[in-house]
Regions:
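Active-site charged/polar residues at nucleotide-handling catalytic sites that mediate phosphoryl
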Residues: 76
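Structural beta-sheet core signal
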Residues: 7, 39, 83, 111, ...
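An aromatic- and histidine-rich active-site surface loop
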Residues: 65, 80-105
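A short, histidine- and acid-enriched strand-loop-helix "catalytic/donor-clamping" loop
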Residues: 86-91, 107-125, 140
Length: 162
């Protein structure tokens, strides 16, 4: 029986770095042969111009997306949930909700950060500091580059970095 992974990651559209990495993972024959995989694209934007903009349609899509993630985690029962959170911006509160719901279901969560922004956003917003603390608590983190570690060292010990 192959280990099960639920990938919650951005894939195109829109096309940007994290979405391209998500597409590479999704299309990887090695990953798909070694693991039983399910994929959920949490993206709410169809173009780069819409990234970071809030609309009523996006709010409803986000709720639907979160319910889909919870349902998939409950039914598929993955051994691991791979999640690509936003590094900065108000999307961290969505990430907090998703990661918390996965942890409540006793799912092992690994986060993959693709860029910086955690430190600067948390320094400017008190509730962001609390959110990041909860998001990173008891999770392992994959960093795209070791130079990203100072951005999250306040929240994640080096022993939980891959």
């Amino acid at each position: 029986m192959k280990p099960k992974i639920l990938f919650i990651m951005h894939m195109p559209p829109p096309v940007h770095g994290a979405a391209m990495m998500g597409q590479y993972i999704h299309d990887s024959r090695l990953i798909n042969e070694q693991f039983e995989c399910r994929y959920i694209n949490p993206s709410l934007s169809s173009s780069v111009a819409n990234v970071g903009k809030v609309s009523l349609g996006k709010v409803f899509a986000m709720i639907k997306n979160i319910l889909n993630i919870v349902r998939m985690a409950n039914n598929f029962k993955p051994d691991l949930c791979y999640y690509t959170p936003t590094a900065d911006g108000w999307g961290i509160y969505r990430d907090l909700l998703v990661v918390t719901l996965l942890k409540w279901q006793k799912r092992k969560v690994i986060l993959h950060l693709h860029n910086k922004g955690v430190k600067s956003f948390s320094e400017r917003h008190f509730f962001a500091r609390l959110a990041y603390g909860l998001i990173f608590k008891n999770t392992n983190v994959i960093l795209l580059a070791k130079e990203l570690y100072p951005d999250i060292q306040r929240y994640v010990p080096i022993s939980r970095i891959s």
